[in-house]
Amino acid sequence: MTETKTLKNFIGGQWVASTSGKEEVVPNPATGEVLAKVPLSSREELDAAVAAAKEAFREWRKVPVPRRARILFRYQQLLVEHWDELARLVTLENGKVYEDAYGEVQRGIECVEFAAGIPTLMMGQQLPDIATDIESGMYRYPLGVVAGITPFNFPMMVPCWMFPLAIACGNTFVLKPSERTPMLANRLAELFTEAGLPPGVLNIVHGAHEVVGGILEHKDIKAVSFVGSQPVAEYVYKTAAAHGKRVQALAGAKNHSIVMPDADLDMAVTNIINAAFGSAGERCMACSVVVAVGDIADELVRRLKEAADRIQIGNGLDKGVFLGPVIRESHKERTIKYIEIGEKEGALLVRDGRRDSATSGQGYFIGPTIFDHVKPGMTIWTDEIFAPVLSVVRARDLDEAIEIANRSEFANGACIYTDSAKAIRQFREEIDAGMLGVNVAVPAPMAFFPFSGYKNSFYGDLHANGRDGVEFYTRKKMVTARYQ
């Protein structure tokens, strides 16, 4: 029997075994098989990573921007060459089906491509002759050592939001990946090193609460980017800000899709099924609430159930599978409790994912679950379940549908299905969410646009990706000069 390997930290360009003596297993969510062990590193090990990043920053900040861009271009090429390998690794440790994982790798590669355009992104501004023989200009500079804390649900894409752009801007980086999906982060570091990244520019420290606390409080870390649940995001924001750090903390969601009476129901149902049950509903842009407007509700619910009944559940590496497992047995149990709560609070359980055959074997499976006649204020409407559970709320008209969506404490994304330009305009102007979709399944923007929403879905001022990302990872210097 082969011994399960324990992952190492990546500090100062070296793979270093943790000395904490604490670790957790990393199971395959589809089978329960142990893939690896992940160390729960100590504060001292984090300190070593920050020290390595601080030392590397002294030289990395001086590397010409075009040379940094060439390393990013080479990194992008290596990611493309290893696309299939990376997608399979995502499926193994996260559980999402291969097609979803393949698309996630594509999104990560797009983030690296965006970061490779750093010569243009780092350009400042200049105004000649603000007075006689005097000109003024703005220049961008890196912050120093920055850190990222990433979630389990996108082990490829979310880290690639963070460290490629931060490093391209001239910073050095400390990454704390999710202890539930830590394997891909190590592979990303290996490929970045192969691309020519100098030692200490990217560091990885595996762990949990102790490492997170150290990141938020460390005096040499200038900025923290976080993606995760709402309570933790709020804690990260408040704690890091109290220690003088720049913070962006992307949090939870309860995304509503409004289906109007004139909607193309075939398209709407296909999109909603993909958005609600793709990646087992474990994504912050998942559709978790459908607002059916007018007299289409019964037909819409019937079609949603029929489509959900056709979904194949199983191991994400098997052909034809659409829905893989959730991340852990504890998450499956949590989802089952929410289904029980939905029934107790009076929602109509149209499709019960607890009864699907795949849920009784090994792995952490829960089938597609649909509730109808859900009322705003019910627990399954209020809470982010983060699982393949879809709630259908009924509304008289668009005004009521928008009012229902805007009552949520979250404001990440929202969609509308309609051919009415008037309805689309009203939706765009009145809905309180950061990322909007019109007749699309998941309105997640490309890497060159900012990502995230409002209210309890985001804490901070500058969002991830796009120009916001460059602003987050740089500071400005204004220079006014007189020429004599």
Swiss-Prot record:
Catalytic activity field: 3-oxopropanoate + NAD(+) + CoA + H2O = hydrogencarbonate + acetyl-CoA + NADH + H(+); 2-methyl-3-oxopropanoate + NAD(+) + CoA + H2O = propanoyl-CoA + hydrogencarbonate + NADH + H(+)
Annotated protein name in UniProt: Malonate-semialdehyde dehydrogenase 3
SUPFAM superfamilies cross-referenced by the UniProt entry: ALDH-like
Gene for this chain: iolA3
Family: Belongs to the aldehyde dehydrogenase family. IolA subfamily.
PROSITE patterns with a match to the protein in the record: ALDEHYDE_DEHYDR_CYS
GO molecular function, one term: methylmalonate-semialdehyde dehydrogenase (acylating, NAD) activity
NCBIfam families linked to this entry: MMSDH (TIGR01722)
Function of the molecule: Catalyzes the oxidation of malonate semialdehyde (MSA) and methylmalonate semialdehyde (MMSA) into acetyl-CoA and propanoyl-CoA, respectively. Is involved in a myo-inositol catabolic pathway. Bicarbonate, and not CO2, is the end-product of the enzymatic reaction.
Domain of life (superkingdom): Bacteria
InterPro entries from the UniProt entry: Ald_DH/histidinol_DH (IPR016161), Ald_DH_C (IPR016163), Ald_DH_CS_CYS (IPR016160), Ald_DH_N (IPR016162), Aldehyde_DH_dom (IPR015590), MeMal-semiAld_DH (IPR010061), MSDH_GmP_bac (IPR023510)
Species annotation: Geobacillus kaustophilus (strain HTA426)
Subunit structure: Homotetramer.
Keyword annotations from UniProtKB, A to Z: NAD, Oxidoreductase
Classification via CDD domains: ALDH_F6_MMSDH
PANTHER family to which the protein is assigned, alphabetical: MALONATE-SEMIALDEHYDE DEHYDROGENASE (PTHR43866:SF4)
EC number, UniProt record: 1.2.1.27
Broad EC category: oxidoreductase
Pfam families, A to Z: Aldedh
Active site: C284
A single BP term in Gene Ontology: inositol catabolic process
